């Protein structure tokens, strides 16, 4: 919660003191990254829910401010804190209305980390919405290009629709479970003891699947992502593509499948084919791009297909691979968009036809971008390779043999689909 505290501190600093504003934000995000590293290194694999913070908020409604970490979210929280710190480091290109930008950036970071750490259904959703609102404003006010307002409106429309569908699904879970608390662990335990009616699960799960899916850019609801990222400030693109986008995937793993397993079995076959569409169509669109940000954005959307396929397998191998690719892609997307922002500052253009000779002009940045491309291609030695290979095995064992064959062909094809 340090970034939210930093946003309040920054709001009291005069706007003329840009250096102090940046230092406060950098300090808060840096300390958050250090604390998340300590938590990650001291996490006990068999220890269940750890690092808990729980305050009773509205006892009559069963609302509690409940944070914690387990095997599902500890790696995502650590990745999110690292990406948040990196995004602050890359926000030096903001030169006007600096105070307002950093207030919103701190709120976005706090919302992102809070959403993944929340163990209460209400705060899980609240923190995500808290992070989304600054995204729209930052693209519209500090974005790049003539289409930034259109991009801001489009991302607002799509993500609001996704959030609304997810909210209806979450309310459905709460009502059908006849719960007296919003605690996610308690809800899961209650559903295990007395499962939600199967007919109810068959309409609750698609609401969650498509609601969370839109937030992740599931095909065909994906067109907001490349446009939004190409227009967004560097820090915003890094944070959203790297971390906030994983909220929907995390929601499916944490909530949708455990609370509506029968509905999941009914709908996950459809999700697997939509995942294939992410890989195929978005990969082909990425190959056609000349703008570096559009390439990275479409490539990022294509990567989501692997994660959706891992989730659709509905087995421990696939879910483990999905979480691993979520973490790897978060770091990869943040690195790619951060370097893209650096290239834009140096060249005032992201036209790839004019960007030859990067290694000669900028050896460090060029080498880092080369590593990002290699990781995006899933070469052995990078986390993407291990995660995606695991997902292939899981999808095959789950019966998605044709989809797995097609995915493997796309994975090994000599196209530059995964430069980002």
Residue ranges and their predicted role:
Residues 1-8:
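Generic start-of-chain signal for non-secretory N-termini
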Residues 2, 25-28, 32-35, 73-76, ...:
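Hydrophobic alpha-helical transmembrane segments of polytopic
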Residues 86-92, 110-122, 136-413:
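Hydrophobic transmembrane alpha-helices and their helix-loop junctions in integral membrane proteins
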Residues 129:
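Short phosphate-coordinating micro-motif centered on Lys-Gly-acidic
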Residues 133:
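Active-site-proximal acidic secondary-structure segment that organizes catalysis
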Residues 414-420:
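A short, hydrophobic C-terminal helix/tail in secreted or cell-surface proteins
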């Amino acid at each position: 919660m340090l970034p939210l505290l930093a946003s309040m501190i920054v709001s009291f600093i005069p706007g003329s003191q840009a250096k102090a504003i940046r230092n406060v934000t950098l300090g808060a995000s840096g300390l958050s990254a250090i604390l998340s590293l300590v938590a990650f290194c001291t996490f006990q694999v068999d220890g269940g829910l750890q690092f808990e913070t729980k305050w009773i908020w509205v006892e009559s409604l069963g609302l509690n401010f409940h944070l914690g970490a387990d095997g599902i979210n500890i790696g995502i929280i650590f990745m999110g804190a690292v990406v948040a710190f990196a995004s602050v480091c890359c926000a030096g290109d903001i030169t006007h209305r600096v105070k307002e930008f950093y207030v919103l950036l701190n709120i976005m970071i706090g919302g992102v980390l809070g959403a993944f750490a929340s163990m209460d259904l209400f705060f899980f959703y609240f923190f995500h919405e808290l992070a989304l609102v600054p995204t729209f404003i930052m693209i519209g006010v500090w974005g790049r290009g003539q289409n930034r307002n259109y991009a801001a409106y489009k991302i607002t429309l799509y993500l609001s629709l996704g959030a609304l569908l997810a909210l209806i699904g979450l309310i459905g879970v709460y009502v059908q479970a006849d719960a007296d608390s919003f605690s996610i662990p308690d809800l899961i335990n209650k559903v295990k003891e007395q499962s939600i009616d199967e007919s109810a699960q068959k309409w609750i799960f698609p609401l969650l699947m498509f609601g969370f899916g839109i937030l992740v850019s599931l095909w065909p609801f994906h067109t907001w992502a490349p446009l939004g990222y190409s227009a967004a400030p560097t820090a915003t693109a890094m944070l959203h593509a790297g971390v906030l986008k994983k909220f929907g995937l995390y929601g499916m793993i944490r909530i949708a499948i455990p609370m509506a397993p029968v509905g999941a079995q009914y709908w996950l076959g459809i999700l697997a084919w939509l995942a294939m569409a992410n890989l195929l169509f978005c990969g082909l669109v990425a190959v056609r791009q000349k703008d570096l940000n559009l390439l990275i954005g479409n490539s990022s959307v294509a990567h989501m297909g692997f994660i959706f396929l891992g989730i659709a397998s509905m087995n421990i191998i696939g879910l483990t691979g999905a979480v691993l690719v979520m973490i790897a892609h978060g770091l990869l997307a943040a690195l790619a968009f951060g370097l893209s922002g650096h290239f834009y500052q140096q060249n005032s253009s992201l036209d790839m036809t004019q960007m030859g000779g990067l290694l000669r002009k900028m050896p460090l940045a060029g080498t880092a971008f080369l590593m990002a491309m290699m990781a995006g291609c899933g070469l052995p030695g990078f986390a993407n390779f291990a995660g995606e290979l695991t997902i292939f095995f899981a999808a095959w064992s789950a019966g998605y043999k044709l989809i797995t064959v097609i995915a493997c062909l796309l994975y090994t094809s000599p196209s530059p689909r995964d430069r980002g």
